[in-house]
Amino acid sequence: MFNNKLFASIGIILVLSSCTNELCFMLTPRIRSIATVLFKLAGLVIATFVFILLMAQVWYDMSYDKPLSARGRVYVFERPTEHPDQPRPYEFWFTRPQIAALRGSSPDVEAVGTMDVDGILQDPRTGELLRETPAAMVDEDFVKVFPFDPLLGSVDGFGRPDAAIVCESAARHLFGSVEEAFGSTLNFYTTEDPTVCEIIAVCRDFPANCRLSNIGVYVPLGSLWEDKNDPNYEAFEAFVLLRKGASADAVLPLMAEAFEKNWVFWESNDTPPDIRERVRQRSRLVPLHDMHYDPADNGTGSRTRDGVLSAIAILFLACALLNLFNLSMAGLSFSVQGNCVRRIFGAERGRLLLKQVLSSLVLCLLAFGVALLLVKLLAGSSLASMLSVPLNAQTLAPVWAVCLAVLAVGAVLAVLFPAFYGASFQPSAVLKGRINLSGRGKNWRVGTLLFQFLLSYIFIATGWMIGVQNRYVSDFDLGFKTKDIDFAFTGIFSGRDPEVVRTVLLQDPDITDVTFANYVLLQDRVFYETRVVNGTTVRFAGLDVTPDFLDFFGLQIVQGRGFTEADGQRATGSYIVNEAFLRAYPAIHIGDPMEGMMTGSHGTEAQIIGVVRDFHFEDLHHPITPFAFYCSGEPSNPAAARYPCVAVQTVAGKAGEVAGRLPGILNELSAQQRQEGGARCTVMEETIARFYAGNDRESRLVRVSSTLSLLLALLGILGLIYLEVQTIRKSVAIRKLHGATLPDLLRLLSGKYLILSTVAFAISVPVSIWVIRWWLQQFAEQAAVPVWIFALAWLMVTGLTLLVVAVMAVYISRTNPATELRRE
């Protein structure tokens, strides 16, 4: 919900707006004219500002990866999973032999770029490992698929095993300048021993809205896993570039057939024919841009969000233009007399109409300029964090053009009817008395008022529901303990002996418990294992853990048993799977054998011994999928750490403090680790917050937009009420002569608006629920839609409307009946 400051701001703005609107019609003609222009300008500036912000985010998503797409020729090949009822029906990670088969499947395939982002850079100046600077291993085809633009050097020599390509920003960060970077060397770690690479090219940074924007260094993939064709080596992304004029529909069957022939199910080649047939028939080529909207690929785009933001932006401008129309109509009683006098003295009707249209266009241009200035100011403030899009001219230019065009056309249309209508009166008739709008004009006003009430309700309910959902996912019980827990990567060397790490960490008085795994429990990138169990091929995410891991996190066993210390000493391994695992593979049961998954090795015997209650190991945008914990006493590979990730339970409230000193403690455990550095730590609750940082930005953006849109709607309502008051002055004067009091005038003015508000509310409830349900589709876990958001929306809109009516009633009650009747 809105905070107290926001509510206070709304109240102040409404009061000031009410006073401004009153001044527009109570002051002298010149001052009233200036005030009216300022009032119109304020509404247009607010609407234009919000339109640019919202549509900037939409345009960012709509154009994502478009600079990389080679005019629509870049695709991602996806094949269906073995089981069609899985929450994630497609896979896009492949082995090197599978990618080679795709590359040779058709002459229309120009190149298939291969990428793996596993690897760590070493700072050439300090020697520290740069885990926060993403680097990628790619093949020669990759530089053919994507448009690298060299500033220095050339990418033609990337086939060398010791070559590297560095982007401009990474070059400045690592070496201080582009010139210093070119020709220099850096170390790239994929195993214990580094690869020394020479920088053969420094290229321009890729645009901010593409998947390569955060990768700073590219090194050759070489022969890594080139001959590995079992599912545990499906670790590479494949980007397909088709030749110009080639049809994706024609190429797809050839690629699917080539992939199916090179698809290996472990040691078994007797894959059921229906599965292989589904691979041939249901594989697909997905345009690169569409991957931005796929949460399985950690895509940050959301078509639901884009639809909601687009609707809000368009309706925002609609509200502002309706306000412009209503204020123009409200000012007719003043402007038409002046225009009639001008016509009597020879002014042409067409010139008067043109003047009003040009005035409206100038007003739009001024509003557009002020809105751009506000956007520029916002770009340098903390409020810019509400958007994931950089607020610069390169990103926003298309949005500016569309906004200016829509604003100009809308503003012209908004003043045309009042201008033509005002010019339709005969000067002699106008100068003899006051004008009244036609019945159709009154019906239009009622319809406009109903529409703005409706928008107000929808905006408020939707904005509050987004806040409800964000609090729901932030506070949602993931199924395991998250409070006061740190996760640390021990480093390559310190993590080789977990018991030494345990002993040292438990000496810290702020640390109460420690456990180990090969990766974090709450994952932003999921790595899948594939096994064959009783003839059934299973695919699941998993962790290799110590026996105390499940107890540490409070994970509940619902069938079978949990791990024991004996399991951690046996040469054969043990599995505990989640409930989703058994739902996905109903033919598998406790006691069934399944090949082990010790870090750095596989092929050992293991058995499923228990089932753990389902828990969320990803953010709540993803459904719960099959997961397995593995534990064994197998000897570790001496060259690698089996459990490089340590989870630490801290004293209440100490997680952040412990996280700050934990990397230093871990780096000191080994002389090699002390030299290399690399240990790092995260607070689990902060990790959860980062998962929903995008949703939090979205929530704040929509709530601010909803607040401003409500303000615009209320200002429009204020203008309509004032117009209504102008048309019933004579009736009010007669009632006052017959003894009508202020409460009588309140009842006279408020009845119709209460009915309109209630009718709009009744219409808005199902519409709001539909919008809310549409938006909630992006979440696997959804909060219930509370009734109070609709009740408070009705109270808020109706209360503010009655407040406006009360202000107008007080104003009109102070008029002199005799003066009003004499004017009539």
Whereabouts are the PLM-identified features?
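Membrane-proximal extracellular/periplasmic loop immediately following the first transmembrane helix
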Residues: 51-120, 226, 233-240, 252-253, ...
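Interfacial "coupling" helices/loops that link adjacent transmembrane helices in transporter permeases
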Residues: 322-361, 716-754, 815-816
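Small-residue-rich transmembrane alpha-helices
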Residues: 53, 284-286, 360-425, 468, ...
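Membrane-helix entry/capping segments
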Residues: 4-10, 28-38, 68, 260-313, ...
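Mid-to-C-terminal secondary-structure elements
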Residues: 139-152, 164-301, 503-694
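Alpha-helical transmembrane segments of integral membrane proteins
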Residues: 2-45, 294-298, 328-354, 358-361, ...
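Hydrophobic alpha-helical transmembrane segments of multi-pass inner-membrane transport and secretion
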Residues: 9-15, 32-61, 301-337, 365, ...
